[in-house]
Design a protein with these regions (language model features):
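Compositionally biased terminal segments of proteins
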Residues: 1-176
């Protein structure tokens, strides 16, 4: 997803939801941190994962999905979409809320996207462990976008993680 597409999806999510702040927890959160071209592993994604703080039951997430989500008229028209999610979708290190990165441009029309900080994002993706997440994490490491010591510290901040998953993530940190 290109930056202009990301801005459009954020603007559309704010309009559909009637809010001026959204939370971005997927790979497109990189737009708040990486200036310029995203790694191919992030740019090829056609969805932005959008949540609204406090929407634990997912009612607003469902509204996003139905209005501008996958297979919607928005998706058919523009070729990208917003995926409605809830905060608990991502497993994150303690304190992540205090590290969110603000993204707002004139093109978001007053809607602020609070995006995961890149190390918190990396940890979340590494824990998810799907092939596309592992590729994403490796690309960030190769490009020097993340710092290994910071990743190690963030992993320690993840509570109640299955020891096998923790071990796998530790391996991804030390050998990107």
């Amino acid at each position: 997803m290109k930056r202009g597409e990301f801005e459009h999806a954020i603007r559309a999510a704010g309009a559909v939801l009637g809010v001026n702040q959204v939370l971005v927890i997927g790979s497109q959160a990189l737009h708040a941190t990486v200036h310029g071209a995203l790694p191919d592993e992030a740019a090829r994604s056609v969805e932005v994962d959008v949540a609204v703080r406090g929407d634990e039951e997912g009612r607003l997430a469902d509204l996003v999905d139905g209005s501008i989500g996958e297979a919607s008229m928005f998706h058919a028209t523009f070729g990208y979409y917003a995926q409605g999610v809830v905060e608990s979708t991502a497993v994150l290190p303690e304190g992540w809320e205090g590290r969110l990165v603000r993204f707002e441009t004139p093109a978001t029309n007053g809607v602020v996207a609070w995006c995961l900080e890149v190390h918190d994002l990396w940890i979340s993706k590494a824990i998810a462990g799907r092939p596309k997440d592992i590729e994403f994490c490796a690309a960030l490491a190769r490009r020097g976008i993340v710092d290994g010591k910071t990743l190690e510290a963030r992993l320690v901040m993840v509570r109640d993680l299955d020891p096998r998953v923790r071990h796998a993530v530790e391996g991804r940190i030390t050998s990107p």
